[in-house]
């Protein structure tokens, strides 16, 4: 009898699935989501729009109205094209699949977004992680040396980085782009609404750069929409490995509707930026807590015992992310999402119990 072990790749058999904990009944501060719902009148209007979507028809593979709205809202350069994905995770997988030549490598600073490494492994690419400095800033000399040694196919730069919140200096990014002449540099701007800095306006200035974004952190995590901006020479190739109906009709309709009213989402992002400052100050005042600078909608905090803090918060029904085992540089670190005022108050009350 044939078994999975007879058919499935050995490296896949050795993997574990990406863990997503059940957050029912918890204050959910583990996944960098926008805590705010849409205003009731806007939600009702969205419901009316979605009620008229033709669910019996396949989605348009390249929905022109949505792409045009993305161009207008984000300022996509005229020379660039836009490729849509079912979240940026799918785009990362598409890039790995398209670039998976024998011996090809993917390079990124670490600790960083885990999907860069996972997608490389899925496509049987070698992943090269370049450690940050001890203070979690970019080690530009190590990056340049790694680029020269490995000549990777793909270089990922999260701008800002997750889970550290670090926003790499523009001059360092420019040096990496220049040194990566044999590579494609993917600048991941998932947290751009909170960083308020972007390489997207300059995407057409480099022949080896694409910029990736997602609607998730802006407040639309549930609809799963990511997009890639870059010169057509690149995007036409990546489009070949895109599943033909990858972005569903409800996502397309919801995204187009909300991009027409993006001021609501922008106002929520502004609230979270202000809350981030206040929350960082409050956590930093707790005994034994060190808060790292963050340009995202989350904070990385070093505590005396990350596992103990996580467990106390779990008891208090507050769910955060214990990242201490992700990388040695993250020893005794936890990551907390910036939530609503009520959620942040619950978080602080629980942290005071965990850090007496």
Swiss-Prot record:
Disulfide bonds: none
Entry keyword set: Amino-acid biosynthesis, Aminotransferase, Histidine biosynthesis, Pyridoxal phosphate, Transferase
GO MF terms held by the record: histidinol-phosphate transaminase activity; pyridoxal phosphate binding
Xref: Pfam families: Aminotran_1_2
Enzyme class: transferase
Gene3D superfamilies: Aspartate Aminotransferase, domain 1, Type I PLP-dependent aspartate aminotransferase-like (Major domain)
Cofactor(s), by name: pyridoxal 5'-phosphate
Matches recorded under PANTHER family: HISTIDINOL-PHOSPHATE AMINOTRANSFERASE (PTHR43643:SF6), HISTIDINOL-PHOSPHATE AMINOTRANSFERASE 2 (PTHR43643)
Assembly description: Homodimer.
Protein name as annotated: Histidinol-phosphate aminotransferase 1
Protein species of origin: Burkholderia mallei (strain ATCC 23344)
């Amino acid at each position: 009898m044939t078994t999975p072990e007879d058919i499935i790749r050995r490296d896949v058999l050795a993997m574990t699935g990406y863990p997503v904990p059940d957050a029912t009944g918890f204050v959910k501060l583990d996944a960098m989501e926008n805590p705010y719902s849409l205003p009731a009148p806007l939600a009702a209007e969205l419901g009316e729009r979605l009620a008229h979507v033709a669910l019996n028809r396949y989605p348009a593979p390249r929905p022109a109205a949505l792409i045009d709205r993305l161009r207008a809202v984000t300022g996509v350069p005229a020379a660039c094209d836009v490729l849509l994905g079912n979240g940026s995770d799918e785009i990362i997988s598409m890039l790995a699949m398209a670039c998976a030549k024998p011996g090809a490598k993917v390079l990124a600073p670490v600790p960083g977004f885990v999907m860069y490494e996972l997608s490389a492994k899925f496509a049987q690419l070698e992943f090269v992680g370049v450690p940050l400095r001890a203070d979690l800033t970019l080690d530009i000399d190590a990056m340049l040396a790694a680029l020269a040694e490995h000549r990777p196919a793909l270089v990922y730069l999260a701008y800002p980085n997750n889970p550290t919140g670090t926003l790499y200096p523009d001059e360092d990014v420019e040096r990496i782009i220049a040194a990566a002449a044999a590579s494609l540099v993917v600048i991941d701007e998932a947290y751009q609404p909170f960083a308020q800095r972007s390489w997207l306006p300059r995407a057409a200035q480099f022949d080896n750069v694409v910029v990736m974004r997602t609607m998730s952190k802006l407040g639309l995590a549930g609809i799963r929409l990511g997009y890639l901006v870059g010169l057509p020479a690149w995007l036409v190739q990546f489009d070949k490995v895109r599943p033909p109906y990858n972005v569903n009709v409800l996502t397309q309709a919801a995204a187009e509707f909300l991009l027409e009213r993006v001021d609501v989402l922008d106002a929520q992002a502004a609230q979270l930026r202000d809350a981030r400052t206040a929350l960082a100050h409050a956590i930093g005042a707790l005994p034994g807590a060190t808060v790292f600078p963050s340009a995202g909608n989350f904070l990385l905090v070093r505590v005396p015992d990350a596992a103990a803090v996580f467990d106390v918060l779990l008891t208090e029904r507050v769910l955060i992310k214990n990242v201490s085992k992700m990388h040695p540089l993250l020893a005794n670190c936890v990551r907390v999402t910036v939530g609503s005022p009520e959620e942040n108050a619950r978080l602080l009350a629980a942290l005071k119990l965990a850090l007496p």
